[in-house]
C-alpha cells in the first residue's frame, strides 16, 4: 500500500516503524519527517502539512492509497476534510470532530450530552471568572487552556496565585477551563474508530511532569510504559461502554463522525473511571510503547477505520512482554529548549538488545551531516523486555550511551510498574 504519513515526531516515527515491520512491503512517504524518519523512508520536507489543499494535491499526484495524520495541528486545521471529499482514505478526524481535542469546552459539551463520566468544569473568559471558579473548587487547583497547547496547557497546583497566573497566560489566547481535581491513577487508552465502531489498543501510562517523582512543570510527556498489569480485566470494556461508544455515537448524531484515533485520557478514582481529556490522534510518548507489541498489522486497522469497515474485525492482538520508553529532552525544556546541539552515540544506544530509537526533534546539518537536536523533546528510547525490570534496564543502558550537551531525562519511568 502507498501510504503518506503527516508529522515529524517520535509518534510518527513509531507509526512508520510499525508499518515497515509488516510483510506487506508498503511504500511510505513522510511529510515533513525528521532525520530518523528520513533514514527509513522517503520524506517530503517542503509540503505544508497544515494546508489541506496542498496535501490533497500531493496525495492525488502521487497516488497515495492511505493518508495518516499524526499531529493534532493538521487535524484541527481540517486537513482531513478535502482528502475525504476527493475520496482518499484518511486516518484522522475532520475539522469538526477534531474539536474534541481542539476545544476543551467542546469536549465537555460532548461528554455532557453523551453522559460520559468526567469532572465538573467551569469555562472562564476573564481573570475574574477564573478566580471565582478557583475559589468554588478549592485546592488542588486545575486550570486548562481551552485550545491546543502542545501538552503544556494544564496546571495542577496547591498555589492559587500560580493557578491564576496560568489562567492569565492562556486567557490572552482564548478561554480557560477551571476543573475539579480528580485523584487517582491516570491511564491512556487508544481506540481506533471508523465513526461507528471502536477497537481498543493496549492501555498505557505516561509521565507528564518534567522531573522524577512527578515534580516540575507539565510537558508533552517524558516517558511511558505498557501494558498496565494493575488494571482490572474489565477496564477496557468499561471504557468502551461508558466513554468511547457514547462519545462516538454523540459525534455521529451531530453529523461529525469521528474517524481516526480516539485517545481517552482517563483517571481511575475511588468513584470510578473519569475522563480527564480527549485527544484526536495517537499520543506521544504512549504510541512508542503501544505499537511495538501490536501483532495485528497496523495498516489493516488504519485502512479499515479510514474506509468504514471496522465492524466485524477482531480486537487487535498484542504480544506478551512489556515496553518502556524514556524521552530525551534538550536543556531548558519545556520553557526555552536549547537547539542546534549535536547528538552522538545513537548507534551504540540502538545496539542494546530490544532497543529502538524514535526520533522527534532531529535534523542533519546540511554541511557536515552531523545529527542535531532541533527542539524540546529530541527522541524516545524504546525498550522491550519480558518484564518491566528488563525493559527499564535496557532503556537506561541505551540512554547512558547517548551524548547531547545539557540533555535531561527522567530516571523513574516505569519504576513502579
UniProtKB/Swiss-Prot annotation:
Binding site for Mg(2+): 277, 279
Gene Ontology MF annotations: ATP binding; metal ion binding; phosphoribosylamine-glycine ligase activity
Origin superkingdom: Bacteria
E.C. designation(s): 6.3.4.13
Cofactor: Mg(2+); Mn(2+)
Gene: purD
Organism name: Leifsonia xyli subsp. xyli (strain CTCB07)
Domain annotation ATP-grasp: ranges: 108-307
TM ranges: none
Name of the molecule in the record: Phosphoribosylamine--glycine ligase
Cofactor, free-text remark: Binds 1 Mg(2+) or Mn(2+) ion per subunit.
Pathway, per record: Purine metabolism; IMP biosynthesis via de novo pathway; N(1)-(5-phospho-D-ribosyl)glycinamide from 5-phospho-alpha-D-ribose 1-diphosphate: step 2/2
Amino acid at each position: 500500500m502507498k501510504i503518506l504519513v503527516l508529522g515529524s515526531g517520535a509518534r510518527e516515527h513509531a507509526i512508520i516503524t510499525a508499518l515497515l515491520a509488516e510483510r506487506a512491503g508498503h511504500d511510505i512517504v513522510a511529510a515533513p519527517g525528521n532525520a530518523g524518519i528520513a533514514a527509513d523512508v522517503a520524506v517530503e520536507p517542503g509540503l505544508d502539512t497544515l494546508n489541506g489543499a496542498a496535501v490533497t494535491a500531493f496525495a492525488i499526484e502521487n497516488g497515495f492509497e492511505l493518508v495518516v495524520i499524526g499531529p493534532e495541528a493538521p487535524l484541527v486545521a481540517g486537513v482531513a476534510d478535502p482528502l475525504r471529499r476527493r475520496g482518499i482514505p484518511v486516518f484522522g478526524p475532520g475539522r469538526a470532530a477534531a474539536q474534541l481535542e481542539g476545544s476543551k469546552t467542546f469536549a465537555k459539551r460532548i461528554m455532557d450530552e453523551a453522559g460520559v463520566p468526567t469532572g465538573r468544569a467551569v469555562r472562564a473568559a476573564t481573570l475574574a471568572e477564573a478566580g471565582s471558579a478557583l475559589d468554588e473548587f478549592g485546592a488542588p487547583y486545575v486550570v486548562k487552556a481551552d485550545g491546543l497547547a502542545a501538552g503544556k496547557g494544564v496546571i495542577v497546583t496547591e498555589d492559587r496565585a500560580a493557578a491564576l497566573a496560568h489562567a492569565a497566560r492562556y486567557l490572552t489566547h482564548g478561554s480557560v477551563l477551571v476543573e475539579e481535581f480528580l485523584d487517582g491513577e491516570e491511564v491512556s487508552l487508544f481506540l481506533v474508530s471508523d465513526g461507528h465502531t471502536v477497537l481498543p489498543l493496549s492501555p498505557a501510562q505516561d509521565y507528564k511532569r518534567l522531573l522524577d517523582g512527578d515534580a516540575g512543570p507539565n510537558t508533552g510527556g517524558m516517558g511511558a510504559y505498557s501494558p498496565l498489569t494493575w488494571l482490572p480485566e474489565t477496564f477496557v470494556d468499561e471504557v468502551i461502554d461508558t466513554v468511547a461508544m457514547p462519545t462516538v455515537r454523540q459525534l455521529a448524531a451531530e453529523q461529525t463522525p469521528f474517524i481516526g484515533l480516539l485517545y481517552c485520557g482517563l483517571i481511575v478514582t475511588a468513584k470510578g473511571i473519569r475522563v480527564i481529556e480527549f485527544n484526536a490522534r495517537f499520543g506521544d510518548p504512549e504510541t512508542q510503547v503501544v505499537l511495538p507489541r501490536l501483532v495485528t498489522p497496523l495498516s489493516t486497522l488504519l485502512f479499515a477505520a479510514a474506509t468504514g469497515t471496522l465492524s466485524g474485525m477482531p480486537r487487535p492482538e498484542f504480544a506478551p512482554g512489556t515496553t518502556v520508553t524514556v524521552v530525551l529532552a534538550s536543556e531548558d525544556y519545556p520553557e526555552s529548549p536549547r537547539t542546534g546541539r549535536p547528538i552522538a552515540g545513537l548507534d551504540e544506544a540502538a545496539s542494546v538488545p530490544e532497543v529502538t530509537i524514535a526520533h522527534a526533534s532531529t535534523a542533519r546539518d546540511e554541511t557536515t551531516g552531523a545529527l542535531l537536536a532541533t527542539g524540546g523533546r529530541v527522541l524516545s528510547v524504546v525498550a522491550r523486555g519480558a518484564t518491566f525490570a528488563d525493559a527499564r534496564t535496557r532503556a537506561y543502558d541505551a540512554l547512558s550511551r547517548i551524548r547531547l550537551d545539557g540533555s535531561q531525562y527522567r530516571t523513574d519511568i516505569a519504576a513502579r510498574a
